[in-house]
């Protein structure tokens, strides 16, 4: 009886929920950090249980990408009254038995693809899915005091000095209202995960020319954090012509 009265009484204290939520979040983060190596060695179905716990966090958390067991992609697109085959591309991480990957890339994406696949050591590429899932790289950013997710377009893999390295390259639209918040999220991600990538770059078109920001540079990260709009950054001396 005393225990029931105590619990009931605690429910009347408005601050207690926030306290317990905070303590539970802190404890879960500590345990996950301590046991991450063991969790990674579990079978997929058991790892999924821990992934769901991570997703309950009040703040974004690092979660490993999972290779999809299978993936379905459209191979045809309707144009008016007719259907046409989608263009196919080689060297994608996921492909059919002929090594083809169907995708409709816009002008910017096509230009980025052409430049990146010609770089020395290029091996293969991955078009990051633009939907929620374990095989999609999602990066948190804040807009209007709310967490949202930006999903960079491309990951390019290359061989360098006998090792496989990865470049994150994201064509960035400047006309959207969330252009700067997304860029801030990418810069913050680059600050905390620079060791995982050879390059982390954002590409945008300014006055008909593609420009690129190296988000691994400290001066670029600092400028992004204090910028008032994204276009100014891509027009400044911090950016280079993308080539």
UniProtKB/Swiss-Prot annotation:
<dbReference type="GO" id="GO:0010165">
    <property type="term" value="P:response to X-ray"/>
</dbReference>
<protein>
    <recommendedName>
        <fullName>Protein YagJ</fullName>
    </recommendedName>
</protein>
């Amino acid at each position: 009886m005393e225990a029931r009265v105590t619990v009931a009484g605690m429910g009347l204290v408005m601050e207690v929920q926030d306290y317990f939520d905070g303590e539970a979040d802190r404890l879960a983060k500590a345990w996950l950090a301590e046991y991450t190596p063991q969790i990674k060695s579990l079978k997929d179905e058991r790892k999924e249980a821990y992934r769901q716990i991570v997703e309950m966090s009040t703040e974004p958390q690092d979660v490993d990408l999972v290779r999809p067991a299978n993936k379905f992609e459209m191979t045809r697109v309707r144009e008016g009254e007719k259907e046409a085959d989608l263009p196919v591309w080689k060297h994608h991480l996921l492909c059919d038995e002929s090594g083809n990957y169907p995708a409709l890339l816009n002008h910017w994406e096509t230009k980025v693809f052409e430049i990146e696949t010609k770089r020395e050591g290029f091996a293969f590429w991955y078009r990051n899915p633009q939907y929620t899932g374990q095989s999609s790289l999602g990066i948190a950013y804040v807009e209007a005091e709310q967490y949202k997710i930006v999903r960079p377009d491309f990951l390019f893999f290359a061989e360098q000095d006998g090792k496989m390295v990865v470049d994150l390259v994201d064509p960035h639209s400047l006309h959207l209202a969330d252009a700067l918040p997304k860029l801030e999220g990418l810069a913050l991600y680059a600050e905390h995960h620079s060791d995982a990538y050879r390059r982390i770059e954002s590409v945008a078109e300014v006055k008909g020319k593609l420009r690129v920001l190296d988000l691994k540079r400290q001066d670029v990260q600092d400028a992004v954090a204090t910028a008032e709009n994204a276009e100014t950054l891509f027009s400044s001396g911090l950016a280079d012509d993308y080539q």
